[in-house]
Amino acid sequence: MDLWTALQALILGVVEGLTEFLPISSTGHQIIVADLLDFGGERAMAFNIIIQLGAILAVVWEFRRKILDVVIGLPTQPSARRFTANLLIAFLPAVVLGVIFADLIHHYLFNPITVAAALVVGGIVMLWAEQRQHEVHAETVDEIRWTDALKIGFAQCLAMIPGTSRSGSTIIGGLLFGLSRKTATEFSFFLAMPTMVGAAVYSGYKYRDLFVPADFPVFAIGFVTAFIFAMIAVRGLLKFIGSHSYAAFAWYRIVFGLVILATWQFGWVDWTAAQP
């Protein structure tokens, strides 16, 4: 492993960690940054699976007490069973649609122009959702109804389009469906666990031949970096939403997306040459 490859792994690990749980699309940022760094091919596909596992481990660690309480309480506590059922209900739409459409979406939509357009559209929707008046009926994740979970699950499916953002879709969906900002954010984090682990296991098995021992040092750098920066992002976001809305993230999406579109329109960067 040369120094440049290690630096690529470090940068992409930071990008994954910081963006995975913020409503700004980690996949979109990965596509753009990987293209700028010329990091692609089979190694990149395997690398992305590994760094996503690093990011999700950060959420598992951050919410380990809640997870342990739920596991212990499953046999006797209705609230634990309801919480688990809601996660499964919200998880199922992504499983079904992901298996059906994942390859088509990866082939046709995994490019910086799609990402830029989705960033802008998602930012506009986020601003609208924040300004829209909606009644809150769930102040904690234990108060979420199964119908809320199902609708959030379908909202999560929008994130199959790169640039949309899985966390953005589920958080904004939660706000629109009656969850408080904190509850929508926390449920998005919990929903990420089965969704991302399931996607990683599916992709890992599908592309198992891409994992070669020579790349393990690169994977290790990305995994550890993603874990550390995802932890920072999760804690920072939970603190941020205590006194702020998601408007700042919406404007970031819009500006970033417009910059990418402008560089493409004026020919400053040949984004159309990017490979998934």
Curated annotation (Swiss-Prot):
Sorted UniProt keywords: Antibiotic resistance, Cell inner membrane, Cell membrane, Cell shape, Cell wall biogenesis/degradation, Hydrolase, Membrane, Peptidoglycan synthesis, Transmembrane, Transmembrane helix
Membrane-spanning intervals of the chain: 43-63, 85-105, 109-129, 184-204, 214-234, 254-274
This protein's GO CC annotations: plasma membrane
GO biological process, one term: cell wall organization
Primary subcellular site in the record, as a coarse category: membrane
Subcellular location: Cell inner membrane
Reactions catalysed according to its record: di-trans,octa-cis-undecaprenyl diphosphate + H2O = di-trans,octa-cis-undecaprenyl phosphate + phosphate + H(+)
Topology of the protein relative to the lipid bilayer: Multi-pass membrane protein
EC number(s) from the headed UniProt entry: 3.6.1.27
InterPro entries the UniProt entry points to: UppP
Record carries keyword Ligase: no
Biological function: Catalyzes the dephosphorylation of undecaprenyl diphosphate (UPP). Confers resistance to bacitracin.
Protein's UniProt name: Undecaprenyl-diphosphatase 1
Origin species: Pseudomonas fluorescens (strain Pf0-1)
